[in-house]
């Protein structure tokens, strides 16, 4: 078996594409989180960009009964619609939002 096939098989063990398997793994994880609740304000952190995937993840966390903290990394490249999506989703889902705004000059120097 070639290296690519071995890598694929290994990845499929950890990240299966079968919805039944994924659903069971998700259920186990959510159950574990809910059962380990202490007196914390949040159950999990969901990174939000304003795109479909992160907004849907936030929605699913709430649907599963979790109390997520939405975290957004503002690097200065946000679109107006992404910002509006984040505002709408966090308001509608009643989720707290923490936005970290980078120092643009420092961030720019890291990209060189």
Regions found by a protein language model. Give the residues of each.
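ATP-dependent adenylation/nucleotidyltransferase module used to activate substrates
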Residues: 1-112
């Amino acid at each position: 078996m070639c290296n690519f096939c071995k890598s694929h098989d290994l990845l499929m063990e950890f990240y299966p594409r079968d919805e039944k398997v994924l659903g069971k793994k998700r259920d186990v994880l959510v159950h574990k989180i809910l059962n380990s609740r202490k007196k914390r304000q949040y159950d999990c952190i969901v990174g939000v960009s304003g795109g479909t995937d992160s907004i849907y993840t936030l929605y699913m966390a709430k649907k599963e009964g979790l109390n997520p903290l939405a975290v957004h990394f503002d690097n200065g490249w946000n679109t107006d619609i992404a910002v509006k999506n984040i505002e709408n989703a966090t308001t509608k889902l009643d989720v707290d939002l923490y936005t970290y705004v980078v120092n643009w000059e420092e961030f720019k120097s890291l990209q060189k």
